[in-house]
C-alpha cells in the first residue's frame, strides 16, 4: 500500500449501517455517495472527487508530491468467509451496453474495499485488482465485473465497531444537507 489511508473507520461504518435501508436498486448509488462523503468528512488526507463521473475514481491524495487516485467499493459479504480466495464480484464500471474488449484504462491507483457486513476495510492496487482480468469472463454488456484475490488485499481495519448512533446521525444529516442543499432562498419560482 503506497497510500496511508486516514479516516474515522467507526464513523464510516456507522454511516454504512445507518444507510443499510438504501441498498436496493437505484438507492445503491445514493448510499455509495453517502459512504464516500463520510470518508471525506472524517478523512485527514483524502479529497472527494467522486461526483465527477468522467474521472473514474472517488478520491485523490498526495503521495510523495504526486496525485494518487483511489476508488472506493463496498458490498455486503465482500470478503467472503467460505474457502474461496476471492471477493464477491465487484462492478468496476457500468458500460450501459458500450463494451470494448480492451484492458480497462487505469483510472485509479488503489482501491478501498469495504465489507459492509463483516466491517472490514482493505486496500488493493489497481494491478492486483485486475491481475486475473479476462475480457471473455469479466466484460459483459452490463459492465466490467472483477473479483479480487483476498491475498492481495492489505487490511487496514477489521471488525470495526460502530461510532455512537447520535454522532453518526449528525454526520449523516450534515452530508444530506450538503448534497441536497436548497440554493435559492427566495419564495419565487
Enumerate the predicted regions with their spans.
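Nucleic-acid endonuclease domains
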Residues: 1-189
Amino acid at each position: 500500500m503506497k497510500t496511508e489511508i486516514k479516516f474515522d473507520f467507526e464513523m464510516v461504518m456507522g454511516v454504512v449501517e445507518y444507510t443499510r435501508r438504501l441498498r436496493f436498486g437505484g438507492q445503491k448509488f445514493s448510499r455509495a455517495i453517502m459512504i464516500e462523503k463520510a470518508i471525506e468528512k472524517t478523512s485527514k488526507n483524502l479529497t472527494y472527487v467522486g461526483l465527477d463521473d468522467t474521472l473514474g475514481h472517488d478520491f485523490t491524495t498526495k503521495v510523495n508530491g504526486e496525485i494518487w487516485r483511489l476508488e472506493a467499493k463496498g458490498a455486503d459479504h465482500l470478503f467472503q468467509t467460505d474457502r474461496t480466495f476471492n471477493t464477491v464480484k465487484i462492478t468496476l464500471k457500468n458500460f450501459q451496453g458500450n463494451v470494448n474488449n480492451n484492458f480497462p484504462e487505469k483510472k485509479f491507483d488503489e482501491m478501498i474495499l469495504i465489507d459492509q457486513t463483516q466491517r472490514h476495510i482493505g486496500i488493493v492496487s489497481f494491478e492486483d485488482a485486475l491481475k486475473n482480468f479476462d475480457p471473455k469472463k469479466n466484460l459483459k454488456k452490463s459492465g466490467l465485473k472483477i473479483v479480487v484475490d483476498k491475498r492481495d488485499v492489505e487490511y487496514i481495519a477489521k471488525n470495526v465497531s460502530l461510532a455512537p448512533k447520535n454522532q453518526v446521525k449528525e454526520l449523516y444529516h450534515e452530508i444530506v444537507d450538503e448534497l441536497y442543499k436548497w440554493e435559492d432562498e427566495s419564495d419565487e419560482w
